[in-house]
Amino acid sequence: MMKYLAAYLLSTMSGNKSPSAKDIEDVLGSVGLDVDMEDANKVVSALSGKSIDEVITAGLAKVSSVPSDAAVSAIAPVVSATPTDALQAGSKKGETKEGPKEESDEDMGFGLFD
């Protein structure tokens, strides 16, 4: 969806006040990208009647509601690992360690087109 949004913004920046799905297709096609017209139409319908300034302001409000790493680290408890802790952890046999789980960055609570 981001490529369609970027193409929409490029069209508006070039002076087109109301870009269509065809305009998005032209922008993306100029750099050799495939276009799904259903997604292009979804972006156009979601942004029709809205100024780019409104969209940016709404996006900034949503971004500011998501905690950043600095805020999370300030809230997180401080854990101290001493050499004896490492030795005790290393002496436990039969335990398997799980690797870090991958995080999903699917929506992150933004819901751009909600």
Swiss-Prot record:
Phosphorylated. P1 and P2 exist as dimers at the large ribosomal subunit. Gene3D superfamilies: 1.10.10.1410. The gene is rpp-2. GO terms for biological process: cytoplasmic translational elongation. Residues 92-102 have a biased composition (Basic and acidic residues). Plays an important role in the elongation step of protein synthesis. GO terms for molecular function: structural constituent of ribosome. Belongs to the eukaryotic ribosomal protein P1/P2 family. This is Large ribosomal subunit protein P2.
